């Protein structure tokens, strides 16, 4: 079984091309995602994307590390467009996902992806409630959220827990500096990540509202540089990298470590993990 | 450039076969290790092993994530023997490393590797100072070090710091249960790891000294089951897995993220990280 390892702003994915044929049966997709994302005994990634290319559009489905299916991811979208363009040599304009159709465009080494409209819903004491397709609490800070985010963790957890009754929130810190915005997000269910696409868009909107208006905002994240075009879309613009092509050896379902960990995560009657015999 | 992703008890490695020719120039090997081990923009691994097979022996060199070269690693050794046996179809009896020659043997699905002799140097109040090729402080515990190790971290750090003036020590916790020993190690410079080969050997020696003597000890780690034959070698016996074959796309040196992170880790005169322009 063939796959590709790709990343956008250090948000990394296993990409499986199912254009010619289904490679992982539908019912196996969640378990494959759990296995493939395991960084030590699988391939190692934040998620798995399955694609079907049908120029001028391409379909992308994305599964998280826990096997759940997500609607959309800006970083994954760029990787898919880069793959279809450079590996399949095809030209695509539309990316189809569970969250609908998104305009995409290759701009030299950069890839632009139309992302859900972002809107400031409420201004509160500590920051801004923003809907960017997913809920964000944008907090302006003078600290450097890229290198100095450790000290922000407790506050981020406090803000997160206040919104937990309403399904929780992604807490995005933004530090305006001379010619760019430095952003890092404490993501719901994940924690700090190198670069959260919707967080970058939410922070750019608030930045433009207070200091702008700006047509385009240049954002630095721990995963690299992104740009947000607010006047057109909005568009999330960034790079993507195709790191390598892989060929699995043997059937991933037979992978002993995956079986052992699935087996050991099942609970014995006493509630303790049931561990296989050390044979 | 071709590589293989392998793991032994969830201690994972990028394997580069240089039998036919040098694949990564000597001077690039440390930098390649730093790039390849990066779990998001590289391949992702604990280390990189370079091998040259010359039956009945095989040479293994191993580089850590930080680019430093290590002398030996039991988990990596099993992966190398599995690769030479199953992928190259060759029969090897001796593994050559910086720490010398090690007897190796394939036993069905298990692989036995001769590891450095282990010796209890001193018995102190909290545990046992053991030389297993590398220094270990073995501490017996009633807690389950596989699932319940969080609570042991502070103590492990305290013990580690007491030995820091003497170069530090790996702190290995061992919990004897009915028919097996449960072991986890707080490794020098790394922290908790799924399975440390020398830690498993050190703990087995102490276990045999107190409750034995035993010819062979069965050990459960967070990375799976290992066995230690004390009467013969000693031998560290365990499984290994070849997960996939990979083909890098383009030159890893040109990998923009690796360049960006190397560039951004260089310091400007003020001491702050020097960050590339967000172009």
From Swiss-Prot, chains A, B:
GO terms for biological process: lysine biosynthetic process via diaminopimelate. SUPFAM superfamilies: Diaminopimelate epimerase-like. The active site is at 73 (proton donor), 196 (proton acceptor). Residues 255-279 are annotated as: Disordered. InterPro entries: DAP_epimerase_AS, DAP_epimerase_DapF. It is found in: Cytoplasm. The record marks 136, 187 as: Could be important to modulate the pK values of the two catalytic cysteine residues. Homodimer. Catalyzes the stereoinversion of LL-2,6-diaminopimelate (L,L-DAP) to meso-diaminopimelate (meso-DAP), a precursor of L-lysine. This is Diaminopimelate epimerase. It comes from Methanopyrus kandleri (strain AV19 / DSM 6324 / JCM 9639 / NBRC 100938).
């Amino acid at each position: 079984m063939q796959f590709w390892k790709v990343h956008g702003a250090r948000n990394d994915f296993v990409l499986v091309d199912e254009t010619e044929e289904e490679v992982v049966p539908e019912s196996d997709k969640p378990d494959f995602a759990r296995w493939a994302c395991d960084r030590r005994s699988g391939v190692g990634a934040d998620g798995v994307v399955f694609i079907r290319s049908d120029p001028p559009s391409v379909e992308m489905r994305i599964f998280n590390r826990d096997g759940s299916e997500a609607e959309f991811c800006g970083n994954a979208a760029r990787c898919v467009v880069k793959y279809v363009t450079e590996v399949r040599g095809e030209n695509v304009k539309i990316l189809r996902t569970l969250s609908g159709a998104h305009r995409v465009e290759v701009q030299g080494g950069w890839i632009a992806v139309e992302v859900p409209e972002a809107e400031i819903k409420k201004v509160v004491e500590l920051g801004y409630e923003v809907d960017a397709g997913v809920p964000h609490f944008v907090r302006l800070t003078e600290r450097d959220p890229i290198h100095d985010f450790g000290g922000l963790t407790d506050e981020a957890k406090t803000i997160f827990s206040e919104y937990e009754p309403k399904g929780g929130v992604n807490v995005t810190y933004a530090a305006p500096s001379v010619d760019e915005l430095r952003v890092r997000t404490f993501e719901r269910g994940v924690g700090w990540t190198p670069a959260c696409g919707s967080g970058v868009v939410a922070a750019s909107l608030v930045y433009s509202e207070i200091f702008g208006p700006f047509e385009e905002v240049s954002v630095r994240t721990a995963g690299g540089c992104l740009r947000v075009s607010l006047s057109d879309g909005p568009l999330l613009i960034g790079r993507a990298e195709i790191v390598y092509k892989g060929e699995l050896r043997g059937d991933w379902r037979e992978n002993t470590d995956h079986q052992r960990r699935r087996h050991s995560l099942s609970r014995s009657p006493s509630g303790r993990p049931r561990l296989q015999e050390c044979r």
